[in-house]
Amino acid sequence: LTGDYVYKIKKAVDLEFLDYTSLSKRKFYCQQETLLNRRLSHDIYIGVVAISINDGCYFLDGPGEVVEYAVKMRQLPEQCAMVRLLRRGKMDRETTEQLAQTLAEFYGRAATGQGINSYGAWETIRANCEENFRQTDRFAGNILDERMFQVIRAATRSFLHRRKVLFEQRVNAGKIRDCHGDLRSGHIYFT
């Protein structure tokens, strides 16, 4: 955070569904994030910058060896975040309806098709849920109550098995879209 810009760096981790372990992969995913998020925020996502080191000093798009990449975005005022507006009771009906209309149009024109359908397939969703439980299992009994973890896992598995036909119907009806994977009130700003 600089006041004018935000520089978002990806951690060198492997989340199985996203592998950021190499510099080239982090660059690729920075480029992907910029490309995908410009669909809704074209004036916010500026591009990808190289972070380099030269004589012990770090530079943005400067001289030296590239050691990292970052997504460069225009910094927005925190008081304009939807999550803050909601907490203060400042989200009015008109703003909510405008947001709903914008999102409906975005979802309506978002890409769909055979390659995208696989992401909404029951087996893919089930595998992703199981992967999440494997990755978070070590927190059960520590950060998250062990019993609650078991309840969440059982409820998720039960839902998936009860709704398998629904997942198949959604794929067959072309309802799976290339949209935003992390759209939530903390990521929506009204400026």
Regions found by a protein language model. Give the residues of each.
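Conserved ATP-binding subdomain of kinase catalytic cores across diverse folds
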Residues: 1-180, 185-191
